[in-house]
From Swiss-Prot:
InterPro entries cross-referenced by the UniProt entry: MinE, MinE_sf
Family membership: Belongs to the MinE family.
The encoding gene: minE
UniProt-recorded name of the protein: Cell division topological specificity factor
Organism: Hamiltonella defensa subsp. Acyrthosiphon pisum (strain 5AT)
Known role: Prevents the cell division inhibition by proteins MinC and MinD at internal division sites while permitting inhibition at polar sites. This ensures cell division at the proper site by restricting the formation of a division septum at the midpoint of the long axis of the cell.
Lineage summary: Bacteria, Pseudomonadati, Pseudomonadota, Gammaproteobacteria, Enterobacterales
Length: 94
């Protein structure tokens, strides 16, 4: 590093480039999080209705998560907390 290099602006680490990089990260994160399909809430309601035909279930026991892994790969993850089965093995509604 020469003497005059100290006074010249560093193009890689200028404040504008740092701000630009940070803004790109924020935009990328928001795009990733906002990719839930519009039909996801309807799908969750329908899945809950089907499950409730067979077991009594609290609506808060169903968790639905949608992830966009790559441009062409989407993952829909369902977590259902089912009630405990009685000792008789009867799974019907009480």
């Amino acid at each position: 590093m020469g003497f005059f290099d100290f006074f010249s602006p560093d193009k890689k680490n200028s404040a504008a480039n740092i701000a630009k990089d940070r803004l790109q990260i924020i935009v990328r994160e928001r795009r990733c999080c906002d990719r839930d399909p519009l039909y996801l809430s309807d799908m969750k309601r329908d899945i809950l209705a089907v499950i409730c035909k067979y077991v009594q279930l609290d609506p808060n026991a169903l968790h639905v998560q949608f992830e966009q892994k790559e441009d062409d790969v989407s993952v829909l993850e369902l977590n259902v907390i089912l009630p405990e089965v009685s000792s008789t093995g009867d799974c019907s509604k009480p």
